[in-house]
């Protein structure tokens, strides 16, 4: 196997947090210690300061580079049997056999636009097959006209052909992040690295980028099958959750300096660490450099649909995204990024809508989400991959959220920390409540593996006309945990969920206690839906599961802090199914409820447990 040396610029992006991410100044007043109400007002003033930074739009030279001038040809489409959701078969549209590949034409148009000093690469109306990634360059806006539908190839090999790093049999790969761990992997469908002043835009929601995540490949599997756990049909050939014989039999084969105790901790008691989804984080724990974490061909880690790394002044606007193989949008270590009026329509596994990671100064405005996982999930590194620092200074406003695991979610990959996040004027519409409900609306999740800090999170003016899931989805604690099995619905059923014991059985290394504090929620109004038992809004109003000290398996005792300093004010949570026990609390301190109505009863109290 051969691999080129990562150039100094990219090495620095992989190893060191950028100054822009490290800074906290966003042009808004600092928080003043003049009482809780004043502090919250100051926080929202800070949020407005973030929004104000996006008043001046990005500017691109007024010249177009139409992809048809570089040889692109539209294609016809046919309907085939495929997945319309993770476990639901149906008819899906795909390019007809013999369709022309537009990869080279789009790449040539972007290169010409960049060489001219920037402008707009225009994808006109029509259906376009692209057998490879669209790679953005500085000062280039890739724009989809009204009625433009870009179908990215569903053949994984097409995303292991054009990367910068020749990894032999694994393909030509790119620097990527997969579930918050750095690696060399298949290219995302839309990709940029270290660029500035870039945009992906559409005329309206008939401007579509399509990842074809549910369209079968030549061997009968689709991208979504790589997740594993198929409920129906033949077993997939391979998946991220199955032991991969291409991975070493001992982590010491790639990290020979590890002690016996370190090896035992990382590998655990079985060979599950050799599945691709566990092998990559194990490489991080072992300190293996990103340049040696080689995946791509022979592995089963699906690429994100849109991934930008180390970019600044980024605009995503006005298009629809369908059927992503994995996370839909994943900016990493980016600054001053805006996503506006984008429709995210992807019901596959891990189809998070928007996952900003280790980013600074982000605005999410006027977007609509219908996702197979979290609608928004803010990330900040995992295991030892925290070099880019926290995600901070994020405003989410005027959005609509339908199906998904969580609406506005922080975590679970948050080892680098998350702070100064503001969500306001959100409608958790949950339109599909009867068949595909939103599991939980406001969600924070971490565990003893992720660790990190989560603080200064503010939510206000939220409506939920159809509540959230009425059924709890219980989690599996570690054997021997003080949390009894099948007892805590931390994955679904609560309107507000703070889960510090998220999926504890998935991680062998649990040595980083999380810190969750200073959470302020106000103006949440939850509606009821009509059931056979009467009007209901959720299973429970609140679920606050603090860190479970039993889970910690580090060398020495660590300070395990409770969830603390949470205020919930002027909220009406409707009528929970479990109105007799409207909240679950474990290891929490100073949770203050003020004018909080649950099942018609007003609560003014401070809770600890």
Predicted regions located by residue number:
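Extracellular "leader-to-stem" segments immediately downstream of a signal peptide or signal-anchor
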Residues: 1-141, 145-310, 317, 326, ...
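Right-handed parallel beta-helix
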Residues: 146-147, 196-207, 312-322, 335-346, ...
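Short glycine/acidic-rich loop motifs that flank beta-strands on beta-rich extracellular proteins
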Residues: 118, 131-132, 153-155, 212-215, ...
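Asp-box/BNR beta-propeller blade signature and adjacent active/binding-site loops
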Residues: 61, 75, 82-83, 103, ...
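An acidic- and aromatic-residue-enriched active-site/binding cleft used to recognize and process polar
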Residues: 126-128, 139-141, 147, 155, ...
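Alpha-helix capping and helix-loop boundary segments enriched in small/acidic/polar residues
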Residues: 96-100, 330, 351, 355, ...
């Amino acid at each position: 196997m051969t691999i080129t040396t990562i150039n100094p610029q990219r090495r620095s992006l992989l190893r060191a947090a950028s100054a822009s991410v490290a800074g906290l100044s966003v042009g808004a007043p600092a928080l003043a210690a003049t009482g809780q109400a004043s502090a919250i007002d100051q926080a929202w003033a800070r949020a407005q300061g973030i929004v104000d930074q996006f008043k001046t739009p990005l500017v691109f030279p007024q010249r177009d580079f139409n992809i048809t001038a570089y040889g692109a040809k539209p294609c016809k489409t046919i309907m085939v049997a495929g997945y319309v959701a993770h476990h639901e078969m149906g008819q899906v549209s795909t390019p007809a056999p013999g369709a022309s590949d537009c990869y080279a034409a789009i790449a040539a148009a972007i290169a010409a636009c960049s060489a001219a000093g920037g402008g707009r690469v225009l994808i006109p109306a029509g259906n376009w097959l692209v057998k490879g990634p669209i790679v953005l360059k500085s000062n280039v806006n890739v724009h989809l006209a009204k009625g433009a539908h870009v179908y990215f190839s569903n053949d994984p090999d097409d995303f292991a052909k054009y990367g910068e790093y020749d990894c032999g049999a694994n393909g030509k790969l790119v620097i990527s992040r997969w579930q918050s761990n750095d690696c060399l992997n298949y290219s995302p469908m839309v990709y940029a690295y270290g660029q500035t002043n870039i945009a992906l835009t559409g005329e309206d929601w008939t401007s579509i980028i399509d990842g074809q995540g549910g369209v079968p490949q030549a061997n009968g599997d689709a991208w979504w099958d790589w997740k594993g756990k198929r409920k129906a049909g033949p077993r997939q050939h391979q998946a991220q959750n199955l032991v991969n014989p291409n991975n070493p039999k001992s982590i010491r084969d790639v990290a020979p300096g590890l002690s016996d105790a370190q090896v035992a901790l990382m590998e655990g008691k079985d060979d599950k660490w050799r599945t691709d989804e566990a092998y990559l984080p194990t490489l991080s724990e072992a300190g293996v450099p990103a340049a040696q974490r080689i995946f791509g061909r022979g592995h089963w880690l699906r690429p994100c649909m849109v991934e930008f790394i180390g970019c600044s002044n980024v605009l995503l606007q006005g298009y629809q995204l369908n059927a992503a193989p994995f996370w839909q949008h994943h900016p990493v270590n980016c600054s001053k990024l805006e996503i506006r009026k984008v429709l995210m329509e992807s019901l596959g596994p891990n189809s998070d809508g928007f996952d900003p990671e280790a980013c600074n100064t982000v605005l999410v405005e006027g977007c609509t989400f219908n996702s197979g996982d979290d609608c928004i999930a803010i990330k900040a590194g995992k295991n030892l991959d925290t070099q880019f620092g926290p995600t901070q200074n994020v405003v989410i406003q005027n959005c609509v959220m339908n199906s998904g695991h969580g609406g506005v979610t922080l975590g679970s990959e948050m080892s680098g920390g998350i702070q100064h996040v503001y969500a306001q004027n959100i409608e958790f519409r949950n339109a599909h409540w009867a068949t595909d409900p939103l599991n939980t609306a406001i969600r924070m999740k971490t565990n003893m593996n992720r660790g990190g800090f989560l603080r200064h999170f503010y939510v206000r003016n939220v409506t939920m006309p159809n509540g959230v899931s009425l059924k709890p989805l219980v989690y599996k604690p570690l054997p021997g945990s003080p949390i009894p099995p099948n007892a805590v619905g931390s994955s679904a059923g609560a309107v507000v969920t703070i889960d510090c014991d998220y999926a504890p059985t998935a991680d062998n290394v649990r040595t980083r206690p999380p810190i969750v504090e200073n959470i302020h929620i106000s103006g949440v109004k939850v509606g009821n839906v009509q059931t056979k038992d009467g009007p209901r809004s959720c299973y429970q109003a609140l679920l606050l599961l603090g860190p479970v000290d039993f889970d910690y398996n580090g060398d020495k005792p660590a300070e395990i802090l409770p969830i603390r300093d949470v205020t919930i004010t002027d909220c009406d949570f409707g009528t929970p199914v479990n109105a007799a026990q409207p909240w679950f609390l474990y290891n929490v301190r100073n949770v203050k409820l003020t004018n909080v109505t649950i099942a018609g009863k007003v609560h003014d109290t401070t809770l600890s447990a």
